[in-house]
Amino acid sequence: MKCLFLLCLCLVPIVVFSSTFTSQNPINLPSDATPVLDVTGKELDPRLSYRIISIGRGALGGDVYLGKSPNSDAPCANGVFRFNSDVGPSGTPVRFIGSSSHFGPHIFEGELLNIQFDISTVKLCVSYTIWKVGDYDASLGTMLLETGGTIGQADSSWFKIVKSSQLGYNLLYCPFSSDDQFCLKVGVVHQNGKRRLALVKDNPLDVSFKQVQ
């Protein structure tokens, strides 16, 4: 897994200097791009808030939420977690901020996007709402999802929603590029008794999206 991360880092210079994609000039989506749908079959709207729900029963289920990272000295909650069961609290609402806003109020499969927890917060914690991928955690052998990212920049904050081979959708982390070969899957690891979203080689998290009323 660590080798895969290092490979992605080696490819970064190639992608960063590519003329086909920058944060100011994202790759255009094809005209037949497929909108992402929520649990009711409606297209995701970047102006609305949604809960990310793990598809599964019991310990395989549970909403995604913002929580305090173990051993973190950050002044605000900065970890992206999944509740331990589908019977429990509701997750933290999120907004999806697409890179192709000129296509209208839609979020498309395979579109580069940012994910932001849509919550009221103090000024100090505003920057701790945007998802990103943190540094390599040697104790867990992977990179953990956290907050503190940036919107619209080619950095550690780019994600995609793609159709799952099982049910629902998967989340991908795509550093600096819209090409799927540079993307890594988002799954779950166990950290201090909690289920933490992280980059995984196998068993990505299958999710659905439910609009927050």
From Swiss-Prot:
Q: Which UniProt keywords apply?
A: Disulfide bond, Protease inhibitor, Serine protease inhibitor, Signal, Vacuole
Query: Between which residues do disulfide bridges form?
Result: C76-C125, C174-C183
Q: Which GO terms describe its cellular component?
A: vacuole
Task: Give the source's domain of life in one word.
Answer: Eukaryota
Q: Where is the signal peptide?
A: 1-22
Q: Does the keyword Signal apply?
A: yes
Q: What is its main location?
A: other
Q: Where is this site: Reactive bond for chymotrypsin?
A: M143, L144
> What InterPro entries does the record point to?
Kunitz_inhibitor_STI-like_sf, Prot_inh_Kunz-lg
Subcellular location, record wording: Vacuole
**Site (Reactive bond for trypsin): which residue positions?**
R95, F96
Q: Which residues form the propeptide?
A: 23-28
* Motif Vacuolar targeting signal boundaries: 25-30
The GO terms describing molecular function are: serine-type endopeptidase inhibitor activity
Reported function:
Inhibitor of trypsin (serine protease). Protects the plant by inhibiting proteases of invading organisms.
Q: Per the similarity annotation, which family is this?
A: Belongs to the protease inhibitor I3 (leguminous Kunitz-type inhibitor) family.
This protein is called what?
Answer: Serine protease inhibitor 5
**UniProt organism field:** Solanum tuberosum (Potato)
